[in-house]
Each structure stands twice: as C-alpha cells, then as structure tokens.
Amino acid sequence: MARIGKKPIQVPDKVKVSYTDRCITVSSDKGVLSRTVQGDVDLEIKEDHIHVVAGSENRKVLALQGLYRSLVNNMVQGVSTGFSRSLEINGIGYRVELNGQTVVLNIGYSHPINFELPDGVTAKVEKNVLTLASIDKELLGQTAASIRKLRPPEPYKGRGIKYTDEHIQRKAGKTK
C-alpha cells in the first residue's frame, strides 16, 4: 500500500539531519530547513538514511507516512542541490526586470507590477525568462504560481506568463 512511505531517504555526506521534539532540521552550507512532524508518524535516522515509520496500519496514517517521506526528501534535496523554476513572459511589450528582491513586470497593464520576492527565493532574468531558485520547494512553487497568476497565458495568441516546460493548448479564432 504505502510504497513511497517505505522507501528510505538517502542523505548526502554534506547534509546534517537532526530530529528532536517531533521537529526535523536539515542543514548544509546552502541553508537550513525545519518542519514539525504531526500525526502518528515518526522518523528514524540511521547513519546516511532516514526512515519514515507509521505508528499504525490505518489508511490515514499510511497516507501521512508517504506525505512526510516526500516532504523530508524535498528538504534533503533542497539543501544539497536546490530547486529552480523558470517562467517565460510572452507578449508584445511584455518585459521583466529585477531590482534587488523586487521583480518588476510590465505585462500589459497600465502600470508596472512590483512583485516582492519572499526571503529564501532568488531570481535571475535573461531576456524574457525569469528563473527562480530556492532550497524550499514549497515556497518556490508558491512564488512561481503567484507570479504566473498575475497574467496567465491565454489560448488564442499565447500571451502571458507560463512555465517554460508548460504546453498551452491553442485555440483557433473565430471564422467569418
């Protein structure tokens, strides 16, 4: 049943993991991430592996086991290699600039939009591609989704902000 939850998490050499008072902390030279473990789920740390253990065979507990295994794995991956997400800005006159921790978007509105990046997320701009990077996968995904929400891609001309790996289903316009 819980195939993902039973898999051990490999911990690289440069990553330090500690688990006290139901709070797991994962750290390396890139940064520190911590999370509180709730429910009937516990963690066992052995040398270079982390095991997520379910307290019972209840369906909800097994679901939580898989959830926490994925969350802890994302924490370990984040502090060791990091995550990045790229957004592509398409449209005539659409531009993106970076001023410190503020992303300035000119995306067809009468005014430029200033989007303040949260702590822990860095940005890089190349032509019409905005690349966000972070050690926290959850925060990175939420930030990218918030920026995309400002001007989602439209299906007729493809204008808007989209993920670089996203495919927009195009529609034909009206015919006379």
UniProtKB/Swiss-Prot annotation:
Cross-referenced Gene3D superfamilies: Ribosomal protein L6, alpha-beta domain (3.90.930.12)
GO BP of this protein: cytoplasmic translation
UniProt key word tRNA-binding: no
Ranges of Basic and acidic residues composition bias in the record: 151-169
GO cellular component: cytosolic large ribosomal subunit
PANTHER family per the UniProt record, alphabetical: 60S/50S RIBOSOMAL PROTEIN L6/L9, LARGE RIBOSOMAL SUBUNIT PROTEIN UL6M
Protein name in UniProt: Large ribosomal subunit protein uL6
